[in-house]
């Protein structure tokens, strides 16, 4: 049982260790991370902080629904946990958004590990596979697109649930 706890803790913290230059703010994520994805989170957070639930974004054309906008992740439960955490610390910063984004790789790691274990793959092999996969360019490149990374992170959990139910 202690080994399982250690494995899950390792799976959760490993992306933060591997991405230490980002985790400790030596590097920043480029592309659309700040100008596009962070802006949605900041807009929603600031309105929530002022006591208003933002259902509509008036800044895009003649306006656009935030609830049905997949880029805003308005109804995504981890986003609301993130907003609550940011409310506790008092601000939603680009750094806290980056930590939220990296946490998606942790979600992916746990899901992939659970999925591989359903096939009775040895723990060491499954752990090694997950750690190598989580540092691959295809996974870490998605840091530029937080919504895509969070959507990708839950794919293995879905596969695990489907496999367990059959």
Predicted regions and their residues:
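Membrane-interface transmembrane helices that cradle and orient dolichyl/undecaprenyl
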Residues: 158-166
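Transmembrane-helix signature of polytopic, membrane-embedded enzymes
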Residues: 112-135
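Membrane-interface helix-boundary motifs at transmembrane edges
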Residues: 2, 117-121, 166
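Membrane-interface coil-to-helix junctions
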Residues: 15-109, 131-156
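Hydrophobic alpha-helical transmembrane segments
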Residues: 5-10, 99, 127-131
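Start-transfer (signal-anchor) and selected internal transmembrane alpha helices
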Residues: 1-21
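Short hydrophobic/aromatic segments of transmembrane alpha-helices and their interfaces
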Residues: 1, 6-8, 36-38, 107, ...
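Membrane-water interface at transmembrane helix exits
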Residues: 82, 113-117, 163
């Amino acid at each position: 049982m202690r080994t399982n706890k250690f494995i899950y803790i390792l799976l959760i913290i490993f992306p933060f260790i591997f991405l230490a230059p980002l985790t400790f703010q030596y590097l920043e994520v480029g592309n659309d991370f700040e100008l596009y994805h962070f802006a949605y989170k900041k807009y929603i957070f600031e309105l929530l902080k002022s006591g208003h639930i933002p259902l509509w974004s008036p800044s895009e054309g003649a306006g656009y629904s935030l609830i049905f906008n997949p880029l805003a992740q308005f109804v995504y439960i981890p986003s609301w946990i993130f907003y609550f955490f940011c409310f506790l610390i008092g601000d939603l910063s680009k750094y806290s958004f980056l930590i939220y984004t990296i946490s998606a790789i942790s979600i992916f790691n746990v899901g992939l590990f659970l999925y591989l274990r359903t096939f009775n793959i040895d723990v060491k092999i499954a752990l090694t596979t997950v750690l190598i996969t989580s540092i691959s360019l295809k996974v870490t490149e998605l840091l530029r697109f937080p919504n895509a990374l969070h959507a990708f992170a839950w794919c293995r959990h879905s596969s695990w649930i489907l496999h367990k139910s059959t």
